């Protein structure tokens, strides 16, 4: 384990970030022995000593199940978040997560599953791990479990823990990876439930998305920044791109990119019919750097060229 230290001139404090590159590194942080080189399951009651707070840069996949509401805030990247009990938080390699180091300690509670990317190599899960987009959600987009869902997740973690206890043989990694995949599939199901139960909030986001696109195309932004990207829209709505994309897909049946492209084409149709600007002027107004790119995209989406559409309408 190594520390990376950042010093803030403004606040005059040192922000230490602990690099957790391996399962062994994280075991050492908890003060426990290695059981398997690539994976571990930890239940909070196993840790009887206080743990120091610090932010951690993970080279692992980590899933936290918190049993209690946190009294303090959690820092995830640059975001601060106070989360509820029975919350699942997902961290993927390269993400920074944890409480800033201030000399305080805490008592471990809940469950934690962590595993290295090497565990997945050559497995079904390794080929599809990127399909579990919630590993890239922001922390305020965490999964909030019902009591029954919580028991399902704990049961999955116990099965993984039991396999680790059985010792390592040629089948171990495949069996453990399959058990992790089952857990992640349950998480996918539970996120679908969460999207449904938060339908009103999701509709509000969809309305704000529409308003954002309307405002974008009536401003100077297309000429300066080009056509709006999914990442830009997600950032303006204070959502991670993956969570935003999944939400739009579940609400509309279209990907966020398809939705943006549809909005561009609808705006283009209005401009073609309602004013006398040239095709090039309309292309630039929509954020296209080259008019031929606009014409090509329009024909692909609408089935005719912009000029043909104008003549028909």
Named regions from a protein language model:
Residues 8, 102-166:
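A hydrophobic/aromatic-rich effector-binding and dimerization subdomain
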Residues 86, 244, 293-294, 298:
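Short hydrophobic/aromatic patch on the recognition helix
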Residues 151-214:
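An amphipathic alpha-helical interaction segment
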Residues 250-289, 311-313:
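Terminal helix-turn-helix DNA-binding modules in bacterial transcription factors
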